[in-house]
Amino acid sequence: MGSIPDKILTWQMVQPTTFNRETKETTPGKIEKKEIPVPDLKPGEVLVEVAGCGVCHTDLGYFYDGVPTVSKPPLTLGHEISGTVVAGGEPWIGKEVIVPAVMPDRTCILCKTGRGNRCLGQKMPGNSLGSYGGFSSHIPVPSIDLCEVRDRGDIPLAHLAVVADAATTPYQAAKRADLQPGDNVVVIGITGGVGQYMGQMAKALGARNVIGIARNQEKLDRALQYGADFCINSKDKDVRRSRVNSRVIARKTV
């Protein structure tokens, strides 16, 4: 288990990339390596020593594409986080955890009807959790939302960071679609990160056939290696002539 640091080492977005529509000039974004104070933890909060943090396309959107963040720069990006609790509530000390990418407020109508992922008051590391994000040595987070890692075997803790978002996004889709063993599943956009996880998730949940549709042949071939049964390149195939007999669950991934 790590120790409580004197400072948090972080890579902060101090300026996102901007584009001037009048002059057509682009001002590159800027990320700086900084040391920031370790905050006093509030009741119910813990300090997590970060083992790994995935780079989500959302992070790229914040930095390169002008997608606004709730917390303004300087801001540490990163919301796919795994690590070890080093301070805070005693029951959590020393435990390996995954920090959810979305932390609902648990009070609104969406939360009370099981749609906490759509909560309008949600907090998100690297966006709306103050200035804190996963591209740092440590991050303070509410303990109520943590997912304890109890038996990861030989899988490095850092590799589990993507479970916070890239893996749980397709899992939620599969559960909401009521995917059943023996179903045939079509994954539209299987060549992206979420799409690849969707294909693997569907197979793990008992799908009879996983059919991937996308346009990048090299990545389609990779999807076959990761468990897809069939792949269709939409650039040179007539998808309308492709038939799947049995129940089909379609999931578009972006």
Predicted regions and their residues:
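NAD(P)H dinucleotide-binding glycine-rich loop of Rossmann-like/cofactor-binding domains
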Residues: 105-189
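Glycine-rich beta-strand-centered segment in the early N-terminal region that forms part
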Residues: 37-53, 66-112, 132, 150-153
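Nucleotide donor/acceptor-binding cores
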Residues: 8, 95, 182-183, 208
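Adenosine-nucleotide cofactor-binding segment
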Residues: 187, 203-254
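Cytochrome P450 core scaffold surrounding the K-helix E-X-X-R motif
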Residues: 58-64
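Eukaryotic N-terminal low-complexity, Ser/Thr- and Lys/Arg-rich leader segments
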Residues: 1-18
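N-terminal Rossmann-fold NAD(P) dinucleotide-binding loop
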Residues: 195-196
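Short glycine/threonine/proline-enriched tight-turn/helix- or strand-capping micro-motif at secondary-structure
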Residues: 27-37
